[in-house]
Amino acid sequence: MIQPLAYIHPQAKIADNVVIEPFVTIHKDVEIGEGTWIGSNSVIMDGARIGKNCRIFPGAVVSAPPQDLKYKGEQSTVTIGDNTTIRECVTLNRGTALDKNTTTIGSNCLLMAYVHVAHDCVIGNNVIVANAVQLAGHITVYDYAFIGGSSAVHQFVEIGAHSMISGGSLVRKDVPPYTKAGREPLSYVGINSVGLRRRGFSAATIAEIQEIYRIIFLKKYNVTKALDIIEAEFTPSEERDEIINFLQNSQRGIMKGFGNT
């Protein structure tokens, strides 16, 4: 159902069963999947690729040009997966040719009111980003991560899968998978054991993750030495290998350990 007071460019591609409320503006180079709902006063700009059964609340702006002085008007996109909710006044900027040329939001995500996602970010599946979080450009957020409200994340930071960041955090360094992060400066405060249990991780797996991070953050080793110990003492597993790969590939370095200054 498309309300007559909405403006939709005749070349926009709108699937079946899409509901578009009054005063929505949809530009030319837009694709919207079936079953999606677009709330009043939202603006869907060129380059938007929206999946099925999404909910985009009033005042959201999807696929705005990147806030990057190097951007010269080249074609780029914002891609949103299926079953994702974009709440009021969220702003999603499309990618730039100097990086991925797209900004990606996965499936089954929740971006709460006033979130900003800058150009070339990649957000995985089942991610929750709470109210007023500000993500700078080129950030990667992996599956099942949670970012607490009013946090600000520095460009190029990576936030690992199943991690949890407390509200109001300034995130300048990478946050490894399965961890909880808090305090200022942002530091390791444990593993996200509650979230892991909710997602079906066994007690043995959670205990192993906890012991791995005890070596990384509590034993005062440098990262290289900690990884050598982990590889020698722990049997290869999906979780162990994900932690090792994340730390080995970190470009900005990881957050501080508990009690470090």
Feature map (PLM): residue ranges:
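Terminal amphipathic alpha-helical/low-complexity segments used for targeting or macromolecular assembly
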Residues: 1-5, 10-11, 16-17, 53, ...
